[in-house]
Amino acid sequence: MLNFKTLQAIDFQNKTVVLRSDFNVPMINGVISDSERILAGLDTIKFLVKKNCKIVLLSHLSRIKSLEDKLNNKKSLKPVAELLQQLLPTVKVQFSCKNTGAEVKQKVQALAFGEILLLENTRYCDVNDKGEIVKLESKNDPELAKFWASLGEIFVNDAFGTAHRKHASNAGIAKYVAKSCIGFLMEKELKNLSYLIQSPQKPFVVVLGGAKVSDKLKVVENLLKLADNILIGGGMVNTFLKAKGKATANSLVEKELIDVAKQILDKDTHNKIVLAIDQVMGSEFKDQTGITLDVSDKIQEQYQSYMSLDVGSKTIALFESYLKTAKTIFWNGPLGVFEFTNFAKGTSKIGEIIAKNKTAFSVIGGGDSAAAVKQMQLSDQFSFISTGGGASLALIGGEELVGISDIQKNS
């Protein structure tokens, strides 16, 4: 897993470097609301500054679906450049409102060694100036990849969050440069997540939540071979409950995946999969007082229109019985709608239970579970928190990380 070239394997002194980082951070009215991903990528940037490199920085931010998305500047990386300047006060950080063309080339040439130029959101290339959706970045357009590759002598990919996507700014550039490697963050992510699928200390217990089972089917299948137990809650548990013939009322069920869920449960001959046994139900999708019902074959008439929005206290106790003795824990996805106070208990209790187990190597697979743990102020109680939700699931699901597969390997 870690046979990629790393920063230490290449001479960076006075070189021009194209660095793909992951600055896909949440913004509210043009203000960064969580800078975790930017902070996580700083070590690589500082290393390259120390080597007196010219650094051409690339990142995407959100999805660009229309010309309006480009013109209203709500998805511009300018606030990221401003924050980088604050975080690196002794380094000159410039921002280019363009990411292709002669003007960009000139700016790179004019850049002094030890300085940084952040180009505009790579996904701006997904919509052209006529408003047509062309997806040059997202579909790995070779001409775009060649242009970005031409801006430097060495390519460093430190964007773990997009490691499972084959885009022009990651997989594409790696094809057209003479030298490439992974950055410190990518190295750390691969090392910690690889441990889970290569040599986890037993018992290895996995907690899966979140709304959809479709995102996690491969993960469940792959983990059946590796984990001792897979504890399932959140919205995704309903598809499995339905597959077992349980009543799910008006809860989210992915009907087209019921048969697949049934096949997975049939494969689970060692009863590794543990499903929620009670749920907190709400009459509609809003923050309200819920009612706790045991999972059963039938639901009383008056609750037929209710939906599950959290796991109940019996499920929390059941999950705790597995988690307190675990030596390795992987958690991806909240166990309820933790944004609603009345349905946050399952997620917060499971977070506390994992944090309390000081002998376990505990990993959070990015995304909403990382946000939940941050909200609970428990982030420092976990061994590792991944910056990539989808990428961590892809890796643990046994998929090839296509965004980094063309990075140079150690010979």
Swiss-Prot record:
Protein localization: Cytoplasm
Gene ablation phenotype (knockout): Probably essential, it was not disrupted in a global transposon mutagenesis study.
Known EC number: 2.7.2.3
Keywords noted in UniProt: ATP-binding, Cytoplasm, Glycolysis, Kinase, Nucleotide-binding, Transferase
InterPro entries, per the entry: Phosphoglycerate_kinase, Phosphoglycerate_kinase_CS, Phosphoglycerate_kinase_N, Phosphoglycerate_kinase_sf
Entry coiled-coil feature ranges: none
Pathway assigned in UniProt: Carbohydrate degradation; glycolysis; pyruvate from D-glyceraldehyde 3-phosphate: step 2/5
Any one Pfam family match given in the protein's UniProt record, by short name: PGK
First-listed, main subcellular location of the protein, grouped into a coarse class: cytoplasm
Residues involved in ATP binding: K216, E339, G366, G367, D368, S369
GO BP terms: gluconeogenesis; glycolytic process
Recorded family membership: Belongs to the phosphoglycerate kinase family.
HAMAP family in alphabetical order: Phosphoglyc_kinase
Name assigned to this protein: Phosphoglycerate kinase
Organism: Mycoplasma genitalium (strain ATCC 33530 / DSM 19775 / NCTC 10195 / G37)
